């Protein structure tokens, strides 16, 4: 970059972020399983990233609803945002819980990736592309469901912990 080309700096993880992605492309695997969008809603520093494979054909309805313009619990964004905002208010107390949950899903994603690739290959060979993509879709939906549930549990815990004040 030329001097002066960048005049403003911004952290990647900011509270007003709607979503973040990390794109993983592995050309030695079939496209359907080799391309993964690790997708996180809300603040990238506080939200889990779920794997959305190139072969994923559908997402939960909550992921199809924009929650950026108003509070709405039919949008997945708010299930993450509530816990994240409450954690931010009392970061010193909430940080350990939130980071433990983030690390859990990060490890789960890394540890299960090879298993997903192998199962995809088995299904592709034995039942065809449609069954293999259905597996990826179900796996993605399961990951999303697990993170939504965990963030809802954190929201309830934080509200209980802070019920007498922040």
Regions found by a protein language model. Give the residues of each.
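C-terminus-biased signal that marks the final domain/tail of proteins
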Residues: 1-166
């Amino acid at each position: 970059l030329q001097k002066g080309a960048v005049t403003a700096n911004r952290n990647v993880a900011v509270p007003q972020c709607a979503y973040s992605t990390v794109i993983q492309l592995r050309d030695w695997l079939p496209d359907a399983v080799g391309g993964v969008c690790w997708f996180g809603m809300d603040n990238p520093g506080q939200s889990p990233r779920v794997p959305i494979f190139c072969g994923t054909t559908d997402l939960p309805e909550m992921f199809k609803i924009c929650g950026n313009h108003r509070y709405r619990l039919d949008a997945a964004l708010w299930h993450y945002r509530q816990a994240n905002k409450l954690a931010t208010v009392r970061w010193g107390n909430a940080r350990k819980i939130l980071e433990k949950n983030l690390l859990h899903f990060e490890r789960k994603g890394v540890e299960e990736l090879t298993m997903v690739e192998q199962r995809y290959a088995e299904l592709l060979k034995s039942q065809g592309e449609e069954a293999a993509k259905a597996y990826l879709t179900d796996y993605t939906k399961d990951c999303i469901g697990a993170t939504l549930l965990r963030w809802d549990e954190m929201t309830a815990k934080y509200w209980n912990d802070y019920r007498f004040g922040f």
